[in-house]
């Protein structure tokens, strides 16, 4: 599964032989990507809001890596995330039942620093705990503003997250804790 906003990412995944399920919120981009990849049977473009979508169900529905409707196969997530949704989307993916082997994302450098921050540093906070509880996080490379058009004012970083195997079992415990806190 991947965010579809960076066309070079789509092309690189296809060249590597990947089956791609691209999730895009913007209807105009969905139409353009559908047209661009109409002759590529290994690409499915889905018009959806990744923050509000059951990603495991989406993967099962579109038969990525197997027969439509079959159990979702283990997958990789690759995205150049809009900076405004980075934190909630990473937590959404890690809290989902999506069988993720690895998540590779490009994020704002300051967010990357928060994702890998050790306890006791100023970068360490709620996002750090939420993500590190569910995944091992590694920095994979820094990306300068000059590679983008138009160039942003911030640097980006490629981050790789390896979801912890025990995260799915922990989700049930986590849900019970949330329910207890909500009850007051």
Feature-to-residue mapping (PLM):
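Catalytic cores of RNA-modifying enzymes
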Residues: 1-183
